Structures are given as C-alpha cells and as structure tokens.
Amino acid sequence: MLLVNENKVHDIELDRLRELLEVLDGKLYQIEKSILNSAEPESDGLFDRGEYFIGVGFVAIQQHFIDSLIALDINKKEAYSLGSKHSSGVSCAAVINAAANWWKHEAEWFKNGSVPKNGERTFEIIMNISNQYEYALSNVLASFSESKDLSLTKSIIPHVEEWTKALLVEPKG
C-alpha cells in the first residue's frame, strides 16, 4: 500500500518485500558458499537451487508491482515503461516483470518446444540480457549488480523505489 502526503511516498508493503528479499539473499549467500566448497556445484544442484530462490524473489517483486498498480489505478503496460533503465535499454521494471514471468513459464515453454505469442516479449527481454537459457535469472540478477554479489535487496530494491516514485508523477491511464 502506498501512502502519499506532501510529495512524500511511504510504501508500507516495501518493508515486507525487503524482508522477504533479505531472507532470499541469505539463502543465496549460503548457496554461494556451498558453490565455493563444491567440486561439482552443477551436479550438486546448487545452481538450480540459486535460480529457484532468485525466481521467487522476482515473482514477489512482480506481485508488489501489481499491488501498486491496483492501488493507483495505473495501466500495467505504461507503468512497466517507467523508472530507471536497465543497461539493455529496457526499463528495469519491465526486466523484473519479464524475469518473474520467465520463472513462472519457462518450463512449460521448453516442454512444448515453443514460446507462445504472449511470452515472446518476456523471452526477448531475458535472452537479450542472459544470452543463454540455463541460469537465465542468475544472469539477469547479475546484470543489475555492481559487484559479484547476487543480492536481490541491494540490486533490485533501489529500482523498485525509483519505479514507485515514477508512478506518482505519471498521469493515470
């Protein structure tokens, strides 16, 4: 929920989102340590495990986006063009949304052998950033990071905050 007064915004749901992402970051940190100590991290399933927690994080952020859009009665397509831009040239919000959709749907796409029409934009955004199918979300998260640390909180929350501020200055539509 967004509370607005005198040009200040307090996103009370953001605190809960941050708390969840911190839990997921703790899991990612444990996985990174395990990777360093593993002779076969891929065979040990550590990369898949990391990808899972990253996907959960992106979906939680997507839910936060949707809650904000509903609260402000703003068009989703327009809203995902707002806020900071990713190095790929697409808005960070659009990349986060695509990452969440990727995590939810990529298994069925590959099982069916094709990406449906409504998934083509997601596929394009993620492949433009990752350049590979395996561990695509890890690559997307890394593309947001200024360091080698994979942190949903440090890498993504600033973009969520900027996006929320941009929602408040754009006309509703």
Language model regions located:
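Long, hydrophobic, amphipathic alpha-helical segments used as structural scaffolds
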Residues: 65-76, 104-111, 171
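Histidine-centered, metal-coordinating catalytic motifs and their short helical/loop contexts
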Residues: 89-115
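Non-transmembrane, amphipathic alpha-helical segments
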Residues: 5, 9-12, 16, 42-53, ...
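Charged alpha-helical initiation segments
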Residues: 1-44
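Sparse recognition of residues in long alpha-helices and their boundaries
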Residues: 77, 115-117
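Amphipathic, Lys/Arg-enriched alpha-helical patches that create a basic surface
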Residues: 21-34, 55, 63-71, 119-173
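Short, contiguous, well-structured surface segments enriched in hydrophobic/aromatic residues
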Residues: 36-90
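Generic structural signal for well-ordered, non-transmembrane alpha-helical segments
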Residues: 15-18, 22, 55, 59, ...
